[in-house]
Amino acid sequence: MLNRVVVQGRTTHHPELTYTKKGTAILRFSIAVNGINSTSFFDCFMKGKDAESHELMGKGTEVFIVGQLMQRRYKRKNGENSFKTEVFAEECNYITFSDYDGTGQNTARNEVIHSG
């Protein structure tokens, strides 16, 4: 079965880096993707060295993500089991937009500054 996600959006908050009991880094963040009529929000995560290398990603950073959908089970505070669908980001590219080039001209420069 095919499970592939490609999405581009802006981070909605600073990412949260945690470690599992075995020492694996997990980076969690959310992105907002503007659609034609509405904005969609996706919770994302990365694992391992990629997670550690993206820890400095800030709120509002535009990212291009390639990955897959994953579902995890967790317990709510009231004890009920619940499920959450997230994007496991296998690749995360930062994209920057510069709207001022120092000459008084607005530009729409687009460059990849990190690929993980």
Sequence positions of predicted segments:
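Acidic, gly/ser/pro-rich intrinsically disordered tails
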Residues: 1-3, 15-23, 52-55, 79, ...
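Residue-level preference for beta-strand/loop junctions
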Residues: 3, 23-25, 38, 61, ...
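A short glycine-rich, His/Asp/Glu-containing loop-to-beta-strand
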Residues: 4-6, 25-33, 39-43
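OB-fold and OB-like beta-barrel modules that bind single-stranded nucleic acids
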Residues: 5-13, 31, 59-71, 89-92
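Short aromatic-glycine-enriched beta-strand elements
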Residues: 17-33, 83-85
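A beta-strand/beta-hairpin structural motif
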Residues: 35-58
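Histidine-centered metal-chelating micro-motifs
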Residues: 51-52, 70-72
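OB-fold/S1-family single-stranded nucleic acid-binding modules
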Residues: 70, 76-97
